[in-house]
Amino acid sequence: MSVSMAAGQLADFRRCSTAEEYFILLDVDYDPRVLAVNRLHILRYFANQLVELHDTRTEAGNPVELLREYRDALIRSYEAFTTASALDHRLFKVLQDRAPQSSFVPASSITVERLTPTVPQPSAPSDPVEPSQSAWPHHAAASADYLGGTR
């Protein structure tokens, strides 16, 4: 690819507005299902990769080389979400705020409390319940007897 052609492609890159446009322009294969589910996460990851790339660069560089680095960054971004989930990367604040907390308990903080066994005391025998009486009467006559009323 010539430098002038790459410069034109860089101008097109700056006008991209969808994830698909980036993938097509940089000639990166993708599964539309993966992109549909992880679109925002891939684009955020890609943006972070580009910031890192530009922070480490000291000069503008050759447009051909820059496009190659952009392509590599997009491939890394896409592959990051084919091998792990959005929850694994936690790129967005809402996911960072809900990050799992550590559940570590040091062994030194565990104590054992030994209880002395108690022997149950025998209880007084209860009054036998007549078969016609029950704790939950099932009809109105039994209910009146149970509540102390008359039939």
Curated annotation (Swiss-Prot):
Gene Ontology biological-process entries: nitrogen fixation
Keyword tags: Nitrogen fixation
Domain of life: Bacteria
A Pfam family recorded for this sequence: NifW
Keyword Ribonucleoprotein in record: no
InterPro entries per UniProt: NifW
Tagged with keyword Cell division: no
Chain intervals for the UniProt region annotation (Disordered): 115-151
Subunit description: Homotrimer; associates with NifD.
Function noted in UniProt: May protect the nitrogenase Fe-Mo protein from oxidative damage.
Assigned protein family: Belongs to the NifW family.
Protein's name according to its UniProt entry: Nitrogenase-stabilizing/protective protein NifW
Gene that this polypeptide is encoded by: nifW
